[in-house]
Swiss-Prot record:
The keyword Hydrolase applies. Mostly expressed in stems, leaves, roots and siliques, and, to a lower extent, in flowers. GO terms for molecular function: N-acylsphingosine amidohydrolase activity. This is Neutral ceramidase 1. It comes from Arabidopsis thaliana. Its EC number is 3.5.1.23. It comes from the Eukaryota.
Amino acid sequence: MELSLVRLWNTCFPSFFYISTVLFLLTGGGVYSHSEYLIGLGSYDITGPAADVNMMGYANMEQVASGIHFRLRARTFIVSEPQGKRVVFVNLDACMASQIVKLKVIERLKARYGDLYTEQNVGISGIHTHAGPGGYLQYVVYIVTSLGFVRQSFDALVDGIENSIIQAHENLRPGSIFLNNGELLDAGVNRSPSAYLNNPSKERSKHKYNVDKEMTLLKFVDDQWGPVGSFNWFATHGTSMSRTNSLISGDNKGAASRFMEDWYEQNTAERSYSEEFISDEIPRRVSSLIENHQDSHHELLELASYFESQPGKPVTRISSSARRVRSALRKADKPGFVSAFCQTNCGDVSPNVLGAFCLDTGLPCDFNHSTCGGKNEMCYGRGPGYPDEFESTRIIGERQFKMALELFNKASEQLQGKVDYRHVYVDFSQLNVTLPKKDGKSEVVKTCPAAMGFAFAAGTTDGPGAFDFTQGDDKGNPFWRLVRNVLKTPDKKQIDCHYPKPILLDTGEMTKPYDWAPSILSLQVLRIGQLFILSVPGEFTTMAGRRLRYAVKTQLKNSGNKDLSGEIHVVIAGLANGYSQYVTTFEEYQVQRYEGASTLYGPHTLSGYIQEFKKLSKSLVLDMPVQPGPQPPDLLDKQLSFLTPVMMDTTPSGDSFGDVISDVPKNLSLKRGNGQVTVVFRSACPRNDLLTEGTFTLVERLEQKDKTWTPVYDDDDLCLRFKWSRHKKLSSRSQATVEWRIPESASPGVYRITHFGAAKKLFGSVHHFTGSSSAFVVT
């Protein structure tokens, strides 16, 4: 009998193990569920022009793109009831969403899908990196430093968003969504604590920290494929990269996305799903999968000596080399894992967690005004990798990645219930807002046409402004009032409406050559079961965000809707569907630090948002329609651009595009983890071809069996930097400097650096080229 049982066990165990493993994979790590929805995810390159274009965020005229730290992407999820409504959420590695970009994306989606995707159920949010190309918003004040509208920046975003949504639509399949949240303590500090302290002490006492520490994560699990992605929301600014950086970068949130996606693809390829999903190591990347030949150092050097630098040569248009690198880890029948690190109420939250210090003395900046000796220009926040901004970006990104990974592995609360949405356009330049009074009565106040205060020009500790502006300035000074009046003098009604903000730029009343600031804003609620996403077109401060979430959550709980009897989750998607700068509390506004001075519509802006979102939430749970509101203007045909086009590219006589100017030394051998390779190539302006879904540079490793070169790192890797520069300011000659900081995870072997580009001839035709360095050894 015992022998029969043993035989039965030996026969059945392999099948039992196989079935158990399959069930584990299907349910996303041991979480058994019944799929509620159709889910689909997508991702597409939105990097844009990597040269000549001013970066969006710091408003620093001198911060002009000249290369790539790593690429930018649009990441999308679609959730649909099998026979019902659907919602779309797009997260952009961009400073913010743009009203005109969304309008044009919706036009394209309607042409392709009819009324399936509209401005009502599509939400688009930006991570707020300050290291992406600017010029893609339609209002004057946001495109002054980019020399007007930049068509390439705009097109890259519209194309990328559309393609990421198309991917997500085509990937729609039955699946489940799980939610988890937890505290991340060391990735953000309050950069305006004096303003936060002006909030009522009773309100502040309800919260342990002066910034939100909670990360909320969604885990998407396909019924057949298992986990296919994750999206999370956490508040910290995209300002780990400084105002002097000129390399396009997704900053800390973009880095976190890259870490999470590479981790998943690598670990599902290398090891069994169950044993590896508890790891929180930074991914080792593709190179770790290549066969590791244990050749002697001498043999590797001898092999490398056969491969000298390749002169530049013309090629057909570059195929998608970047996708070749990462696709090495993917299954042909399954799309890549998509992980987005989304922005929420980050208005007063800085990733420069060491605090703000004076450059000249090393002492902490003035608490109330963030100045050094009365001036703001010397006060800078320090990230955890100070003075290395790239290291700070990596560290803050890594901290978010590790938190997300922990939440991902433990996510067990399944989203269940309706998919729905509400959207409205609201004119915030003249909104009547009803406020409760202490005596139980109410009063009606108004928001104001947009205006920016003097402290706006002071900047923040993440990026100080110029001249003699200071934060906390509620008076202004005569000289800058005179300068202001040349543009537009605010009338008494506007001054009184914005009080105590001294108006520097009366943007809401400036209309030449077209509108300087928005008046009509997009407000949106997306519902997935017990999760409600509030899409707001601005940067809410910590306490402003808390008040909005609390008001909406209270409205939902008190609705009497039986579907909402359990736990309700409310998250704010910041910088979404447009941009209108900051939103502070009424009390923070009185202090007039940078955030208060940048609250466009006056002291009652937040109250206006709360009022309108309560209306939207009520209509959502009661299944009532809402009026669409006034349509925002389409100013695309009015845009002006003063960015000089690329006229032509040239090389010195006898040289070719792609030639190596500065090669690696002969017999170069470097150790992993502490070596760096630098190669300089004859190049051409990256604006000639953005190489979307491609790469300007590769690190390639020699496959010794067949003597072929395999791509292992590209310009979407943080260890590889592509830097472009002209010979002189207006020169038609240029060069590309490629720097590879060899990671500890790189496999020993023979390597080379390859550069791709596109050159423009005098009469407009563009031809592509490539060139490669000599080989070198990594041990």
